[in-house]
Every structure is written in structure tokens, then in C-alpha cells.
Curated annotation (Swiss-Prot):
It is a single-pass membrane protein. The gene is cloA. Pathway: Alkaloid biosynthesis; ergot alkaloid biosynthesis. It holds the Pfam family p450. This is Cytochrome P450 monooxygenase cloA. The lineage of its organism: Eukaryota, Fungi, Dikarya, Ascomycota, Pezizomycotina.
Length: 507
């Protein structure tokens, strides 16, 4: 045995020990944390999958790797564990006790957003502290007040007319109409109108706008981006991968937003106080320099564009597409709706009077039922248990626990909505509907209710009224007997709703 061999062996062993020690040092905290989460955590006795108790990666597995949505598993898990409360993460639970919804989302609620869930969000969605949120919401509120939304009806009418012309051109060419894209174009144009004081048109031609193509691509990676944001950024550097396409889409989306923002800012400054159309950019520029606290609370408009496009257009377009599907899938619903629209055709075709359209009872029932059954924001939006803790059933939850009750848990509760998987607008009409509006919660409730609720209702009512008053349509495409969807923070249909225009009833 030579001295050289001993020295070489000692050198190899030293590197082995270094690597082993490094691995132990890196993994030990994770292992110890996992053991604590499963066996010693205050939530250890709450039923649920052990993997969910072990790590938040379990939710990521369902949300992104399986691309189905963790929230779609909750109903199965509640049934499997025979419990109204289940553990869905190391520090998160989900409950189906509907009375608990009032506790979390009532006015003046002290249940704050879960920082760990929203840490990679920006703008309005990321605001945890009530003061900052109230300041920003108050700053934007006039843009989304009923009076301001009523004033958007002429723009929406113009956009609908342009869309209808495009739909007729496609029909004349023997094509079907992809309503998902038509509706996304309409809803995005409306929210951009509020974001910028510019006349931005996404509907000049029959081609789908590149801005919308880019946005759709970004939404396919939404869970990855809000969970592990550095991963897509690094992987996007690899040529030829889907992440490279993601990077290209992000660049396209960002370039459009930056160009619109810069042009709007320039025009606003050049106007030197002259009256310009109200918008996010105008309101930001109107902030006074001496109000430092307010300026700190209100983000730069460009930082919040994605949130408003996703929350203000994608959810509305998705819901409206679902409405088209359910109306056209049910001859009785379609007939009842068209009869009502025909009886009031003048307020749609001639006057386009939103104040009258919004009072059509069956139209409103169809919209409420669509919001219920489609659940545009289906996932958990966790809130933190305040000081003092709380008891749900037989389980005590300490302060700091993340608690969710999804809209699905409400919308498909058989005690509130008999036959919950059936599309029944009539449930919202007449004596049997008394008290049901309390559970019309698609836009949430309380201080964090969606700021764009009034805009969404304008679009839903007017778009459905216009198209079903004007066109006879039939479903085509691959939707089949039911709509297949996934949870990408907002719900997304896997198959676009497509229709064939049978007749233009206004010609």
C-alpha cells in the first residue's frame, strides 16, 4: 500500500464527506420542517392528505404539473375524509361550512389576506394592509362607480357592432365563430378603456390581436409564475422550449402595455391640465406631490395592468362564453330569453339603454345562474385567522392559520342550490328566490369585493342581450355535453365555445 494511494484515497474521502455534509446541511431543514408539519404542527389533527400537510408543493402539483387545479380536488377530499374541514397545506385549511363565509367576508372583517399566498402578486391583488387597499380602491372607485359605467355603454355598443360585422363576415365565408375570442376581445377592450385615456382598438380586423394571443399564453403558466416566479424566467432562456415562447409572449404583452402607458402619459402631460378622459393613468398623474403617503400606497399604473386584464377581462369573457354554452344547450332557456329580449327589442336595438336592459328579469336570472355554475374564480383565496383563533366544528384553529372557503363550496351546496349541477335560471325568479341573492358571490363580498363588479355586469347584460336579440345561433366545436375547465387562478375552458350563425334577425 503506497503513500500516494493513501493520499489519493484521503482526498477522495474528503470530497465525499464535503458533498455528504453539504447535502445533509441543505436537506435537514426541509426534513425537520416536514416532520414538524406532519406530526407537531397545530393543524396536525385536521383530516387531509399527508402530502398536503408536508409541503405546499402538493398544491403546485395539482395546479401546474397536472394542470387541473387543486381546488377541483377539494370536494373529493371532503368526501374522502368525511369532514367539513380539511387540511390543504402545511398552514392552510378549507371548509365547506357556508355560514363561515359570512365570518370571513363580512364588512369590517379583520381577516386579512394570506401574505404567503399573495407574495408574488402585484398591485391591488398583493395589498394586505387595509389602509393601503382602501387608499388605492378609493383612488380608483370613481372609474368603476355606476355612473361612470353607465357612460361606457356607447363604447360597448360600438364594439358590439364591430364584432357582429366580423361574425357575419366569417359566416359568409362558411366559418364558425369562436365566441371565446370574440368575447375576450370585447372585455379586454373595455378594461383597457379604463386603464388608459387612449382609443385602443383590439377589433380592427378579423385576426385575433397579438396582445390577446400573448396574454393567453401567459395565463397557461399563471400558477408557476405566482408560485416559483424565478423558474420560468430561467427556463425561458432555453431556445425552442415552451418557456421560450412564454418569454416571447411576456415581451409582447409588456411591449404593448409599455407603449400604451408611455403614449398616454405623454399626452396627459402635454394637455397641461386640460380635460381628458378619466383613466388609471390620469388619476395617477393627478396625485399631488405633497401627499407622500397616498403616493406610496398607489402603484404605478403599469404595475397593475396584468391584474386588471386578468381579473377584469378574462373572468368576464369566460363567464359570458359559459352563458352562451348553457343558453344554446337548453332550448327552454334559449326560448325564454329570446322571448323576453324580443318583447324589449327597442331598448336593445334602437336605444341600447343600459338602465332598462339591466332590469330584464330573465336575463338577470340567466346571468346569476351562469356566475353560479361557471365559478370564474374557483380556487382558494386564503384569509388569516385573527388574534384569538377560531373554532370550526370540533377543530380549533390558532391565529395565523390560512382559511379558505371556495366559491365552489357555496355554488354547489345542495342545501342552498338544489340540483346544483343543472343550469336553472328559474331558481333566481319568484318566491323561491327569496334570500338566494345572498349567495350570488362570484364577485366576493365585503371590503374586498371585486372593484370591477359594475363593469362586469354591464358587459354580461349588454353582450348577451345584443347577440341573442340579433342572432339565431347554434353550438359547434368540441364542447360536447359539458364544458371542461381548469383552474389557472381564474377558470379557463379547455375547449373554446364556438357557434354557427344561422340568421341575422335584424336584417
Amino acid at each position: 500500500m503506497s503513500l500516494q494511494w493513501l493520499q489519493q484515497t484521503r482526498h477522495e474521502l474528503s470530497w465525499t464527506w464535503i458533498l455528504l455534509t453539504t447535502c445533509i446541511a441543505l436537506t435537514s431543514p426541509l426534513v425537520l420542517k416536514g416532520i414538524y408539519n406532519v406530526y407537531f404542527h397545530p393543524l396536525r389533527n385536521i383530516p387531509g392528505p399527508k402530502l398536503a400537510a408536508l409541503t405546499d408543493f402538493y398544491a403546485f402539483y395539482w395546479n401546474w404539473i397536472r394542470d387541473e387545479g387543486y381546488s377541483k380536488q377539494f370536494s373529493r377530499l371532503h368526501e374522502q375524509y368525511n369532514s367539513p374541514i380539511i387540511r390543504i397545506g402545511p398552514n392552510n385549511v378549507h371548509t365547506t361550512q357556508v355560514e363561515f363565509y359570512d365570518v370571513i367576508f363580512k364588512s369590517g372583517s379583520k381577516w386579512l389576506k394570506d401574505k404567503s399566498f399573495y407574495k408574488y402578486f402585484n398591485g391591488l391583488d398583493a395589498m394586505i394592509e387595509p389602509y393601503q387597499y382602501r387608499t388605492y380602491r378609493t383612488h380608483l372607485a370613481p372609474l368603476y362607480a355606476q355612473r361612470a359605467i353607465d357612460g361606457l355603454a356607447p363604447k360597448l355598443r360600438s364594439d358590439l357592432t364591430n364584432s357582429a360585422s366580423g361574425m357575419m363576415r366569417q359566416t359568409e365565408n362558411g366559418q364558425t365563430v369562436n365566441m371565446a375570442k370574440v368575447l375576450r376581445t370585447l372585455s379586454t377592450s373595455m378594461i383597457l378603456h379604463n386603464l388608459f385615456s387612449l382609443d385602443i382598438s383590439l377589433n380592427d380586423g378579423d385576426e385575433y390581436h397579438p396582445f390577446l394571443e400573448a396574454f393567453e399564453q401567459l395565463m397557461t403558466q399563471s400558477w408557476l409564475f405566482v408560485t416559483y416566479p424565478m423558474v420560468p424566467m430561467v427556463l425561458s432562456l432555453i431556445p425552442g422550449t415552451s418557456f421560450a415562447r412564454f418569454n416571447s409572449s411576456y415581451t409582447t404583452f409588456s411591449n404593448y402595455c409599455t407603449a400604451w402607458n408611455d403614449e398616454d402619459m405623454r399626452k396627459q402631460r402635454e394637455s397641461e391640465g386640460q380635460s381628458t378622459r378619466d383613466s388609471h393613468t390620469r388619476r395617477y398623474l393627478s396625485l399631488k406631490d405633497d401627499d407622500a403617503r397616498k403616493k406610496t400606497a398607489i402603484p404605478y399604473p403599469l404595475d397593475d395592468v396584468f391584474n386588471f386584464v386578468a381579473g377584469g377581462s378574462d373572468t368576464t369573457a369566460y363567464t359570458t362564453a359559459c352563458a352562451f354554452y348553457h343558453i344554446l344547450s337548453s332550448p327552454t332557456v334559449r326560448e325564454n330569453l329570446v322571448v323576453e329580449l324580443d318583447e324589449h327589442s327597442s331598448i336593445i336595438r334602437d336605444e341600447f339603454d343600459y338602465n332598462k336592459i339591466q332590469n330584464l328579469p330573465y336575463l338577470n336570472a340567466v346571468i346569476k345562474e351562469t356566475l353560479r355554475i361557471s365559478v370564474p374564480v374557483p380556487g382558494s383565496l386564503p384569509r388569516i385567522v385573527p388574534q384569538g383563533g377560531i373554532t370550526i366544528g370540533s377543530f380549533s384553529l390558532p391565529a395565523g392559520t390560512g382559511v379558505s372557503i371556495t366559491q365552489q363550496a357555496i355554488s354547489f351546496n345542495e342545501k342552498i342550490f338544489p340540483l346544483p349541477h343543472s343550469f336553472l335560471p328559474e331558481r333566481w325568479i319568484g318566491p323561491k328566490s327569496v334570500g338566494l341573492d345572498k349567495w350570488n358571490i362570484a364577485f366576493s363580498r365585503g371590503p374586498r369585493q371585486c372593484i370591477g363588479t359594475t363593469l362586469a355586469y354591464l358587459e354580461l347584460r349588454c353582450v348577451i342581450a345584443y347577440f341573442f336579440s340579433r342572432f339565431d345561433m347554434a353550438l359547434t366545436g368540441n364542447c360536447g355535453d359539458q364544458l371542461r375547465w381548469v383552474d389557472r387562478f381564474v377558470a379557463v375552458n379547455l375547449d373554446d365555445v364556438e357557434v354557427q350563425i344561422l340568421a341575422d334577425r335584424w336584417t
